[in-house]
Amino acid sequence: MSSTEPSDQLAVGLTQVARYRAFPETAGGFTLPNAQSSDRHIFFSLPGAIAVPAVIYWRTRRFGKPAFSIRINDFTATQYTFVDGDEAERTWHEIIPATTNAGPTLRPDNNELTFFARDGSLVFGDVVILYTSNQTTIPLHA
């Protein structure tokens, strides 16, 4: 007699893979404020993004004591004002929550990343978002 009986239950697995989105338009850095504006908006997609906490990374180089903020859709990732003791160059990271009151923080499409700076000059660069996707492959667009 066997102590193992066949299961009547079917297990269903959900695909979840770690992905990253590097922003090539930030590789050389961009300065805010500039002659045109004190903010910069980047619109982007994250194929298969699901409502799981994510991470954003970026670097800054400051001139003076600027204040800045970074928003991702309805979430303010960072608000900071530099002081005299702060280093001129710095790398940053922030956790992006899975959801806000408006719904998922990151979406597969129609995301907006907003950089703002005032009271000095700040170079932002090398922006990367790590996120969780439900797609194992992503189509390449020519």
Q: Where on the chain are the PLM-derived regions?
A:
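Beta-strand-rich recognition domains
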Residues: M1-A142
